[in-house]
UniProtKB/Swiss-Prot annotation:
Keywords: ATP-binding, Cytoplasm, Kinase, Nucleotide-binding, Transferase. It comes from the Bacteria. It is an enzyme of class 2 (transferase). HAMAP family: Uridine_kinase (MF_00551). One of its GO terms (biological process) is UMP salvage. It is found in: Cytoplasm. This is Uridine kinase. Its main location: cytoplasm.
Amino acid sequence: MAKIIGISGGSGSGKTTVVSKISEFIPEFVLISQDNYYKSVGDYEYEFSKVNFDHPDAFDNNLFYEHLKNLKKNSPIDMPLYDFINHKRQLKTVMVVPTPVIIVEGIMIFVEERVRNLIDLKIYIDTPNDIRFIRRLKRDISKRGRTLESVIDQYLNTTRWGYYRFIEPTKEYADLIIPEGGHNDKALYVLSTFLKSLSKEGLDFV
């Protein structure tokens, strides 16, 4: 069975940076982003402005779980792709062929017990709120077609609440907590040393 490394934390915490660091020591892996499993806005019965993207129900949790389960069993999947500008799932999918290591990242991957049980190594990125907000603001404006006002509105109305209600509490499930995200050189050194030793020993996490 494939081994799954899960990386979670609030939006803008530095998950992508940590994935990049891991890639230096485990060069062959498949990356699954929970973001691709957002539901299309058209799936909701109410208008877009009322959609809460910072709630577990915003994701297609059943599909996400089934895909991780299949990958763990070394079965390929057709991963969805999410269009953040139009807020809907694209018509095309990407076939993902599993490798010995699967890295899955997302803000709420530790929320559901059934998903947690599939993850062999859980890493939580703990970054201060102000830094995360600034990173999210820059990303959403430059890459997701958002306005300054809409990002601030979303943060104050749903993102901040969702973080404290659903995301931060999942720290208790983490095997490793990395403060300051991808800029904590000491923590990343410890992680890289650990992963390097696992790689030499055949990646037996448990």
